[in-house]
């Protein structure tokens, strides 16, 4: 049996660099690279992407942490010093998405960029960043599912890391990481093979795909707050699925109306 992975990847004197941070930053850098490559297609200056990230990233981290702390308040109210210990894990993706989306809306309006265009070029990078970021949960042994008798279908390193509190745990981090990776691949395929993609289509796909996957996977987890029979994140998932479907519907209706006007 292998030992569990040390959450600290590198120690430089008093400075500790955590795997969690490496996963988040790696995903962020890849997302920025992709968005900058896609920006010219929408007539957006690639320099705006970096300006946006420098503003949005810290706010998104605060939003993600705040969301997590609010829904784990029973613990943090008794351990207030832990509220800022983000290196130990404990950030909620939905909190980061909500905060990041708010900043994106403000930034797009300020720089006269169509919000849906900005979202369309951001969505692929966000999805692959989420896929990479889930491996930070793996190292920290968090965001896992119920206890199971064995995980023989997985590599030894994953099985050992998912042996928590005397039991193997369902590796929900892995399921979500793979789900997001598949979603990212589909977006690339749609962009390559379907030249008829309209404004907002990629954003709609992202919202529906991510929401569906998160709804199912969240139901496997054991560490989420319940509300009216479902986990809070499942309610948020339902909301973004509906948002994605409504956006797709109205974009298609507008497309039909435009076609009729031209003919």
From Swiss-Prot:
The keyword Oxidoreductase does not apply. InterPro entries: Lgt. Keywords: Cell membrane, Membrane, Transferase, Transmembrane, Transmembrane helix. It is a multi-pass membrane protein. Its EC number is 2.5.1.145. A 1,2-diacyl-sn-glycero-3-phospho-(1'-sn-glycerol) binds at residue 134. It comes from the Bacteria. GO terms for molecular function: phosphatidylglycerol-prolipoprotein diacylglyceryl transferase activity. It is an enzyme of class 2 (transferase). GO terms for cellular component: plasma membrane. Pathway: Protein modification; lipoprotein biosynthesis (diacylglyceryl transfer). One of its GO terms (biological process) is lipoprotein biosynthetic process. PROSITE patterns: LGT. It holds the Pfam family LGT. The chain crosses the membrane at residues 15-35, 52-72, 83-103, 112-132, 170-190, 200-220, 227-247. It is found in: Cell membrane. Belongs to the Lgt family. PANTHER family: PHOSPHATIDYLGLYCEROL--PROLIPOPROTEIN DIACYLGLYCERYL TRANSFERASE, PROLIPOPROTEIN DIACYLGLYCERYL TRANSFERASE. Catalyzes the transfer of the diacylglyceryl group from phosphatidylglycerol to the sulfhydryl group of the N-terminal cysteine of a prolipoprotein, the first step in the formation of mature lipoproteins. This is Phosphatidylglycerol--prolipoprotein diacylglyceryl transferase. The lineage of its organism: Bacteria, Bacillati, Bacillota, Bacilli, Lactobacillales. The gene is lgt.
């Amino acid at each position: 049996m292998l030992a569990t992975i040390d959450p600290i990847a590198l120690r430089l004197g008093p400075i500790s660099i955590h795997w969690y941070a490496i996963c988040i930053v790696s995903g962020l850098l890849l997302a920025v690279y992709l968005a900058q490559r896609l920006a010219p297609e929408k007539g957006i200056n690639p320099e705006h992407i970096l300006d946006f990230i420098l503003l949005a990233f810290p706010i998104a981290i605060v939003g993600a942490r705040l969301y997590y702390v609010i829904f784990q308040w029973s613990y943090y109210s008794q351990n207030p010093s832990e509220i800022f210990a983000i290196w130990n894990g404990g950030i909620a993706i939905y909190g980061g998405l909500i905060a990041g989306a708010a900043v994106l809306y403000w930034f797009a309006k300020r720089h006269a960029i169509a919000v849906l265009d900005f979202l369309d070029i951001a969505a692929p990078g966000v999805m692959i960043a989420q896929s990479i970021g889930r491996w930070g949960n793996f190292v920290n042994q968090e965001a896992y599912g119920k206890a199971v008798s064995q995980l023989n279908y997985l590599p030894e390193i994953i099985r050992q890391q998912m042996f928590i509190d005397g039991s193997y745990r369902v590796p929900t981090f892995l399921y979500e990481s793979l789900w997001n990776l598949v979603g990212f691949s589909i977006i690339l395929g749609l962009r390559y093979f379907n030249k008829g993609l309209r404004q907002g289509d990629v954003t709609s796909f992202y919202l529906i795909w991510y929401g569906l996957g998160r709804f199912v996977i969240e139901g496997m987890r054991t560490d989420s707050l319940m509300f009216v029979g479902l986990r809070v994140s499942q309610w948020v998932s339902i909301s973004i699925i509906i948002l994605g479907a409504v956006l797709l519907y109205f974009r298609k209706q507008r497309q039909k109306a435009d076609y009729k006007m031209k003919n």
